[in-house]
Amino acid sequence: MIGILNRWRQFGRRYFWPHLLLGMVAASFGLPQASAHDGTTLAETSARSLNIGSATRIDRLVMLQESARRSSFSVDYWHQHAIRTVIRHLSFSLTPSVSTVAATVPLEAHKLALLDTLNALLTHEARPPVIIRHTTQRQVSSSPRHHIGLWLAQVCGIRAGPPSALS
């Protein structure tokens, strides 16, 4: 009886939950985040953003355009958690097992590229691009503040060049 329960638990951990998470993430890719207070659909929001007559003031029109533009960057916490979990499961399943047979056969290039991409997606936080407008150049002085040769000659009594240059 315990063996059956252990096998069912292993089956759930290996197959059921990762595939369920993968299905949830795959189904939710490309869909905008649905807010709880707004019951509009995609067609209504696109029609409303294109209808200039409904926006009475220009600042409201700008806010509508910015909200439509920013909606692709808003990611729900649980959606992001599910994506990271699926990426982690995929990266563990694609990692080769350490054995003598697996060590002799190298991984194909596409598997290595996929592992690198999954690692980058898992470790780097996605942020929208930001334009940096105010940049200042650093002032670099051409003459060094401290001459080692002068210090050696004055403090230690060691001459590091001709006597006319040191005095």
From Swiss-Prot:
Name the record gives this protein: Secretion monitor
Lineage, highest ranks first: Bacteria, Pseudomonadati, Pseudomonadota, Gammaproteobacteria, Enterobacterales
Signal is among the record's keywords: yes
Signal peptide: 1-36
InterPro entries named among the record's database cross-references: SecM (IPR009502)
Natural source organism: Erwinia tasmaniensis (strain DSM 17950 / CFBP 7177 / CIP 109463 / NCPPB 4357 / Et1/99)
Intracellular or extracellular location(s): Cytoplasm, Cytosol; Periplasm
HAMAP family: SecM (MF_01332)
Disulfide bonds: none
Pfam name, any one: SecM
Gene name of this polypeptide: secM
